Swiss-Prot record:
Protein name: Proteasome subunit beta 2
Chemical reaction(s) catalysed: Cleavage of peptide bonds with very broad specificity
EC number assigned by the record: 3.4.25.1
Residue span(s) of the pro-peptide: 1-7
Quaternary assembly: The 20S proteasome core is composed of 14 alpha and 14 beta subunits that assemble into four stacked heptameric rings, resulting in a barrel-shaped structure. The two inner rings, each composed of seven catalytic beta subunits, are sandwiched by two outer rings, each composed of seven alpha subunits. The catalytic chamber with the active sites is on the inside of the barrel. Has a gated structure, the ends of the cylinder being occluded by the N-termini of the alpha-subunits. Is capped at one or both ends by the proteasome regulatory ATPase, PAN.
GO biological process: proteasomal protein catabolic process
Activity regulation summary: The formation of the proteasomal ATPase PAN-20S proteasome complex, via the docking of the C-termini of PAN into the intersubunit pockets in the alpha-rings, triggers opening of the gate for substrate entry. Interconversion between the open-gate and close-gate conformations leads to a dynamic regulation of the 20S proteasome proteolysis activity.
Origin superkingdom: Archaea
Amino acid sequence: METKKTGTTTVGIKAKDGIVLAADTQASLGHMVETLNIRKIIPITDRIAITTAGSVGDVQALARMLEAEARYYQFTWGKPMSTKAMANLLSNILNGNKWFPYLVQIILGGYVEEPTLANLDPLGGLIFDDYTATGSGSPFAIAVLEDGYKKDMSIEEAKELAVRAVRTAGKRDVYTGSRKIQIVAITKEGITEEFVEFND
């Protein structure tokens, strides 16, 4: 039985005043496009979100787990869990399941104490960075990010770069959509979401 290929492109950028996450909205299965309207960025709290690349069921299970842990932390300590703490928690969860791994690659971004961006692999490898990309189109997206990123970018500049990175990946990676892009910005005021659509 042939394994059906799936794919996506998600990117994260640390800006001067927050975090920008972006992803295509296409869900593919093999050579078929299942939908053009899936959300691949999931809010965990009002200041932290994750992007999804990999098994949808695994990502949804992890998101529910992180939401519960964040609520428990808030209830116990009377303050929100920091982005770094949540990234380390997720890293421990993934590493603890390395013999039966979650088939995911996740970007976690948030602004609790400061803008923080992390990339996690299926075995819990954790890297904090200024920009990152995941999914089948990530080799194309990361090239755009490396070329266009600069320290102290504004949120708007980071949004423009993120859209350009996902669009470029969508033009070269058959499993990444390029017609509609989900963008989430996380600042100290909270999370905002928007969609950018293209006709070509």
